[in-house]
Amino acid sequence: MRLHHLHVAYLDHKASSSSSSPAPPSISPSSIPGSAAFPAFSFKCLRPLAPKISLPEPRKMIAPPDFVVPRARNASKLLNYTVQVPAAGTTRWNPSAEQIKVLEMLYRGGMRTPNSVQIERITEELGKYGRIEGKNVFYWFQNHKARERQKQKRAALLTLSTLDPSLLPATANETKEAPEKKEKDVEDGLASCKRRCKAWGDGAGDGDAVVATEAAGGCTDEVTLELFPLHPQGKA
């Protein structure tokens, strides 16, 4: 009954409001399924909507110009350094005329192997005429000595090749006379051996026998005689 009275009051209120001004269409409780379980005033007390949460806008990560400019400058510097790299082979020592003149003057003065102190002084002095290092001075003296030795060897060979040809026959004659001289020396040695055997002989006959024996043997074997023989040689 109470629900019926509320429904009638709602219709009367609707009729009075529709006569004064047009009202927007409303939803009747009967059109909603299960509306009998809820009172009519529950449709008027609507729950307010939740407030809209506004999210912050995503920030755009933009690098400041202070960080960009130095990178560009560094890149340009690296490019310049890359371009300015010296080409291969430029580290080789190219002596100037003044440097060679001073080094040759020192070499003619008697300097052959300078020590570390001398090399340092020479390098400091030659640095006025161009780029030079201590190792360049050291190797220059070593190479100069090697070239001088080669020149001396070539000069000696050239001197031997240009000797007087008249000296060659004399050398050949000396070569031919060498065997004859050797034979003469052998004969002289044999004669001295015979004389030595005669001096040690006890008698004339024994001496002849000893001489004959020595002559037959060619005096090739030396015989050691006793200083005081008990028996004469050749006799028992």
UniProtKB/Swiss-Prot annotation:
Any one annotated GO CC term: nucleus
Matches recorded under InterPro entries: HD (IPR001356), Homeodomain-like_sf (IPR009057), WOX4 (IPR044186)
Keywords: Developmental protein, DNA-binding, Homeobox, Nucleus, Transcription, Transcription regulation
Superkingdom, natural source: Eukaryota
Coiled coil: none
Keyword Zinc: no
MF terms (GO), sorted A to Z: DNA binding; DNA-binding transcription factor activity
Ranges for region Disordered: 169-188
Compartments reported by the entry: Nucleus
DNA bind region: 88-152
Chief location bin: nucleus
Bias-annotated ranges (Basic and acidic residues): 174-187
Keyword match Transcription regulation: yes
One record GO biological process: phloem or xylem histogenesis
Function: Transcription factor which may be involved in developmental processes.
Sequence similarity: Belongs to the WUS homeobox family.
Stated name of the protein: WUSCHEL-related homeobox 4
